[in-house]
Regions:
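Residues at secondary-structure transition points
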Residues: 131-134, 172, 203
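Glycine/charged-rich beta-loop-alpha catalytic/anionic-binding loops adjacent to active sites
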Residues: 54, 190-197
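A conserved active-site-flanking secondary-structure segment within enzyme catalytic domains
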Residues: 166-193
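Structural detector of well-ordered beta-strand residues that form the stable sheet scaffold
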Residues: 150-151, 172, 189, 200
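Catalytic-loop motifs flanking and including active-site residues across diverse enzymes
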Residues: 68, 204-211
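Extended, subdomain-level signal for the structured scaffold at the beginning of enzyme domains
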Residues: 2-150, 158-161, 178-179, 188, ...
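A short glycine-threonine-serine/GTX helix/turn-capping micro-motif
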Residues: 197-204
Length: 280
């Protein structure tokens, strides 16, 4: 049996367990009483290397951007054997910047000290508030210092930078605020996904899908990632070619870019305060 065929058998079972078992489910998780997976598969042909025990923590904070989180979470949750935790200050639902509420599965204190992956989503004003929340910053700095992989999407890289995790690293983020990374000592890069050693950062919002697939390949292998991509039918063909400043009409770029002077000013102030606190 080919690797691709083995994967589709295994990944379909993994996806079913995620659907019936919740965010933190793994391929070995039993469905809740009275709810059984509709598909049963023979897993005996699965390559041993495709079953892991990854510990993944995805940070939640008020006002996060939902797609920043949900896109990568789909791919992380399809890593067979992985434990994917949604971590916040409390277990109370956390509301995104578009009003979608997500229930955390662990608090900051309950999150494992040693992680395979730390992930931080971005947002607008919410990430700035998070950057000024000393408890969140301390958590990100602590877990990120030991995590095997430190990752983010969109303006989430600003929070990583605020925690001192991107100093001297190449990194990306949402185009509106990418250059602010330099104020924290990072090296801004205009790419959709940037890997520098064990730091992997994604550009704005939808780049989380690409980051998620990138991490699946890193944590398993390319065939596994291709199988997850096929399972998700991820083959984007947007109706407009306006997804970057390089391709969007200049009037649109000017309009969107002109909405964020306050965001940029506050982010730069946080950077100055951070550097001053370090004596820099």
């Amino acid at each position: 049996m080919s690797n691709r065929r083995r994967f589709l058998i295994a990944a379909t079972s993994s996806a079913a367990s995620v659907l019936v078992g919740g965010v933190g489910a793994t391929a070995a998780t039993a469905p809740p009483p009275g709810r059984e997976a509709s598909l049963e598969h023979d897993m005996s042909a699965m390559p041993p290397s495709w079953m892991g025990a990854d510990k993944i923590a995805m940070l939640l904070y008020p006002g996060f951007t939902a797609l920043d989180l949900v896109g990568p979470q789909y791919f992380f949750a399809n890593l067979m054997g992985a434990s994917v935790q949604l971590v916040a200050k409390t277990r109370a639902p956390v509301t995104s910047d578009t009003g979608l509420s997500i229930v955390p599965t662990a608090t900051l204190d309950e999150c494992p000290a040693d992680l395979d992956v730390l992930f931080v989503p971005g947002s607008g004003g919410g990430v700035l508030n998070a950057m000024e929340d000393l408890a969140l910053v301390a958590f990100v700095a602590d877990r990120g210092a030991r995590a095997k992989w430190v990752t983010s999407v969109c303006t989430g890289s600003l929070l990583l930078a605020r925690a001192g995790l991107l100093t001297g690293y190449r990194a990306t983020g949402h185009w509106v605020a990418r250059d602010v990374l330099g104020d924290f000592g990072a090296i801004p890069v205009d790419e959709r996904v940037v890997r520098d050693r064990n730091r992997v950062t994604g550009a704005g919002v939808s780049a989380g899908l690409d980051l998620g697939l990138t991490m699946v390949a890193e944590l398993r292998d390319r065939s596994y990632a291709e199988g997850v991509q096929l399972l998700a039918e991820y083959a984007p063909k947007p109706p407009f070619d306006a997804g970057t400043p390089a391709t969007a009409p200049q009037a649109v770029v000017d309009m969107i870019g002109g909405m964020f002077p306050g965001f940029i000013a506050r982010a730069r102030r946080i950077a100055r305060d951070t550097q001053s606190a370090k004596g820099g």
